[in-house]
C-alpha cells in the first residue's frame, strides 16, 4: 500500500485580496498543520485579520486559492467551514445568559437537548466557568466574557479556532493569565488555534509557529526562537523585540566589520565585502570597563524599567546602542560594550525568506 502524503489542514496558494486599487494581500503563501498554535503577528493594517477573515469565509480572495483539508473553499460559505472565530469584542448575546450563549451554535445545528446540555456543561468546565451557567453577560468580568466566547466557539466542535486579537481589551495581568490559559487549552484539546495579535510578547509566549505579516505579505515564518534569533530583515528584527541594528560589511565568512572594527560572528554564505545590517539584542550586551569592551561607548541616557535599566550609549562611530542592564550607569561616562560572536546576527539587504533559508542550510551543512 502506498503511504499517503500528509496534507496541510489549511493552505494559501498565491492568495491576493484587492479593494479596487488597494492591494490588501499580495500573493500570500502559507501552510497550517493540524494541532498547533499559530500566530499571525503584525502591525495594524498589515493584513493579519484579513487572512483570518479569508479562512473563516467572511471574505473571498480576488486571486489565488484557499484550501481546507485539500479542498478549494474560495466560494464555500462560512457556515460550511469547520472553523469558528472569537472576536476582540467577544460578540456575545447580551439578552442571553452564559448557558444560552454557549448553547446557541449547537441549537442552530439542531442538536438534541441532551447533547446540547452535555456540550455546554463540558465547554464551561473546560474554560473553568462551570458555576456560571445562570449568570447574565452583564454580571461577569471581561476575562470571564472572554472565556464564554471561547466556550461558545468550541461548542460548535471546530477543527480550527480563530482568535482575532481577543486579549487586547484586557488589563496587563489578566492578559498574561489568559495567554497561559489559551495555550494550555489548545494543548489539551489538540485542535488548531490561529491567533491574531500585534503584541510580539504574546506571539513569542504562546505560539508553536509565527507568521510575521507586513504590508499584505508574509515577511517571515518560523518558530518563536528562530524568528527572534534569526530575523530575516530590518522590519522583523525591529518588530520582534528590541534590536540594535547598525550598518556593516561582511568581509568574509564569519567576519564582519561595523563601527570601524572587525568582529568574528557565526554567519556565512555572503559575498566578500557585501553590505549588510548587523543585529545585536540589548540583553546580549554587557557594560564593562572600556579596556574589556569590544566597543567603546559614551553613556547617553538611562531609564529604570522595574527589573532592569534601559541604557542608551553612543559608540565612537556615532551608532546608538540600547543596553538592558541590571545596574545603573553614569550619564557621560566612558564604558565598554562586551558581546560574543554568537550574539551577532547578520542580515543581507532585501533577502527573500526562500534565499535566507537556503543560505542557512548551505553553511550549516558544512559544520
Curated annotation (Swiss-Prot):
Its main location: membrane. The complex is composed of two ATP-binding proteins (PotA), two transmembrane proteins (PotB and PotC) and a solute-binding protein (PotD). Residues 10-240 form the ABC transporter domain. This is Spermidine/putrescine import ATP-binding protein PotA. It comes from Oenococcus oeni (strain ATCC BAA-331 / PSU-1). It catalyses: ATP + H2O + polyamine-[polyamine-binding protein]Side 1 = ADP + phosphate + polyamineSide 2 + [polyamine-binding protein]Side 1. Keywords: ATP-binding, Cell membrane, Membrane, Nucleotide-binding, Translocase, Transport. The keyword Ion transport does not apply. It is found in: Cell membrane. The gene is potA.
